[in-house]
From Swiss-Prot:
Modified positions (N4-methylasparagine) in chain numbering: 72
UniProt entry keywords in alphabetical sequence: Antenna complex, Bile pigment, Chromophore, Electron transport, Membrane, Methylation, Photosynthesis, Phycobilisome, Thylakoid, Transport
GO biological process: photosynthesis
Family the UniProt entry places it in: Belongs to the phycobiliprotein family.
Protein name (database record): Phycobiliprotein beta chain
Binding site for (2R,3E)-phycocyanobilin: 82
Cell location: Cellular thylakoid membrane
A GO term from the CC aspect: phycobilisome
Membrane topology: Peripheral membrane protein
Length: 169
């Protein structure tokens, strides 16, 4: 798992180059947003249970067939597994926010997830929608916590959505 800084260093080291203007700007941007990234992680941590609960509620309101008999979140065990997975996505998105890199998502979330879900018969579409809903809720929470610019929060959620969505359908 790498953060934005170690990823940048690795790329320039492999090329045998000094940092150019683009690299310096990337580093500057990462460090300037560092305080907001940490504040975001703190706010997400303090509200994680509520974020997951709201995400699940909204997802099941939008797609009630998931919790009806025969639905993928029908039964207490499956419902709990869905919420557990949402919590998992939130936790790793938070790591990616702080790191400023999506490497942790590739290494710990996305590798093998699609195959696992397919083998268990878990539909990817509602998972992707749940991640999108979660992003919206997180951004609302961060706005309420006084974090004005939350654009950096989009990246991990959009990345998971894109990676899961592209490869399943």
């Amino acid at each position: 798992m790498r953060d934005a800084v170690t990823s940048l260093i690795k790329n320039y080291d492999v090329a045998g180059r000094y940092f150019d203007r683009n690299a310096i700007e990337s580093l500057k941007s990462y460090f300037e947003s560092g305080t907001q990234r940490v504040q975001a992680a703190k706010a997400i941590n303090a509200n994680a249970a509520a974020i997951v609960k709201q995400t699940g509620s909204k997802l099941f309101d939008e797609q009630p067939e998931l919790i009806r008999p025969g639905g993928n979140a029908y039964t207490t065990r499956r419902y709990a597994a869905c919420l557990r997975d949402l919590d998992y996505y939130l936790r790793y998105a938070t790591y990616a926010i702080v790191a400023g890199s999506m490497d942790v998502l590739d290494e710990r979330v996305l590798q093998g997830l699609r195959e696992t879900y397919n083998s268990l018969g878990v539909p990817i579409g509602p998972t992707v929608r749940g991640i999108q809903i979660m992003k919206e809720i997180v951004k609302e929470q961060l706005g309420a916590a006084g974090i004005p610019n939350t654009s950096f929060v989009d990246e991990p959620f959009d990345y998971m959505t894109r990676e899961l969505g592209e490869k399943d359908i």
